[in-house]
A protein has these predicted regions:
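N-terminal membrane topogenesis motif
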Residues: 1-29, 51, 83-92, 216-236, ...
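C-terminal transmembrane helix end/exit motif
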Residues: 2, 35, 70, 146-151, ...
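Alpha-helical transmembrane segments of multi-pass membrane transporters/permeases
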Residues: 12-25, 129-135, 148-174, 186, ...
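Helix-terminus/linker motif at the lipid-water interface of multi-pass membrane proteins
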Residues: 30-45, 116-119, 238-273, 288-291, ...
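Alpha-helical transmembrane segments of polytopic membrane transporters and translocases
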Residues: 34-35, 46-63, 92-95, 135, ...
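Helix-loop junctions and terminal segments of transmembrane helices
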Residues: 64-80, 151, 266, 270-314
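Alpha-helical transmembrane segments of multi-pass membrane transport and lipid-handling proteins
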Residues: 91-120, 171, 178, 277, ...
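Hydrophobic alpha-helical transmembrane segments
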Residues: 130, 159-208, 225, 265-267
Length: 356
């Protein structure tokens, strides 16, 4: 009974820590979305969303799920209290994120004309995609730093990195959108991703390791489990990312960029803002589950506890969105975005079933 109460407290503690971070991130995201809605309108939001969904799809294809699988390897190494073992796993992870990051960069750069044609129906955005290819490398390297912090249970550092990254990203984006309007979207995405990398790296370097030589053979041997498990874990995420991209690309090709912007706005309210609750909870959940994965009884108990708390938190939030949907849309965006009210109400119902 005492262990159960302690587990609930741990879940609430981690969720509160990252819940606070996510609330702050939501505020930053709301401000950014409001600025885009006012300065760039639905068209600007549509273009930004298409760029993001396209690079996310390529990233999902090339990152091999290291952002998830490597947490387990680092958590297991941490449990051994063997500094040599920990340093070896960290070294392998850092090599893998560089390799997979460059893979994403090269693939996006080479396929830029095709991506532009598929996404926008023309090749006018080829140069933009080639510039954005560098964000695939920055994002994967940032993911590697975050995995290190999460696996080593340095959750406060991870929270601080996310907080600072959100603020810096906003401060970078606003002037670019104000002065360059739609032309500022690509520079804002590139500079923001680079800033996030620098911030995450500044925190991860505080984790002390011992000098360790890791051969190419050891890198392949150690990295094989990360890549194999990561690829399997990433399949479900890849399907979700691909579906998100296909929907946006379809809307872009059959409708207009304004329609894509409206869809992005509706999805952001439920899928991103409310969905951040799941992100906050998963930050502590996965490392804890990895630590007890061999004990089916404890793993089952932890999963049930996590589901109960998810319903407890998300239920009231969804009720608020359902009641004040129209007011929320006008406040978060503008009157131009009111057609998404129906979408929000149906999405809220789906989000509840996701929590259950």
């Amino acid at each position: 009974m005492a262990d159960s109460r302690s587990s609930y407290r741990q879940i609430f503690k981690a969720t509160s820590l990252f819940g606070g971070v996510q609330v702050f991130n939501i505020i930053i995201s709301i401000i950014r979305s409001k600025i885009i809605a006012v300065l760039l309108g639905p068209t600007g939001m549509g273009i930004s969303g298409l760029f993001t969904s396209t690079t996310s799809l390529v990233g999902s294809l090339t990152n091999f799920g290291l952002g998830t699988s490597a947490v387990r390897n680092i958590s297991e190494a941490r449990e051994t209290n063997d500094k040599g073992r920990i340093s070896k796993v960290i070294t392998v992870l850092r090599r893998l994120v560089w390799i997979t990051g460059f893979l994403g960069l090269l693939l996006t750069f080479i396929l830029a004309p095709t991506l532009s044609k598929l996404t926008f129906g023309n090749e006018n955005y080829t140069i933009a995609f080639r510039w954005l290819s560098i964000t695939l490398l920055f994002t994967q390297l940032t993911s590697g730093q975050n995995v290190l912090l999460q696996g080593m249970r340095q959750l406060k550092f991870l929270a601080q990195a996310n907080l600072i990254g959100s603020v810096v990203g906003l401060l970078i984006s606003v002037p670019l959108y104000y002065f360059y309007r739609i032309d500022g979207i690509v520079p804002a995405l590139i500079i923001s991703s680079f800033a996030s990398l620098i911030i995450a790296w500044s925190f991860s370097k505080r984790i002390k390791t011992v000098p360790t030589k890791v051969s190419k053979r050891e890198t392949l041997s150690e990295g094989k489990s990360m890549l194999t498990m990561g690829f399997m874990l990433s399949l479900s995420g890849l399907i979700t990312t691909a579906a998100s991209y296909i929907i946006r690309a379809y809307i872009s090709n059959t409708g207009s960029l304004d329609d894509v912007g409206l869809y992005n706005a509706g999805f952001a309210i439920i899928g991103s803002y409310v969905g951040l609750v799941f992100t906050a909870m998963s930050t502590d959940y996965y490392p804890r589950l990895s630590g007890i994965a061999q004990n089916n009884v404890k793993a089952k108990e932890l999963m049930n506890q996590q589901a109960e708390i998810a319903l407890f938190i998300i239920g009231p939030i969804l009720c608020i969105f359902l009641i004040f949907a129209n007011w929320a849309v006008i406040l978060l965006y503008s009157t131009k975005f009111t057609p998404i009210n129906g979408m929000i109400q149906w999405s809220a119902l789906g989000m509840y079933f996701k929590a259950a």
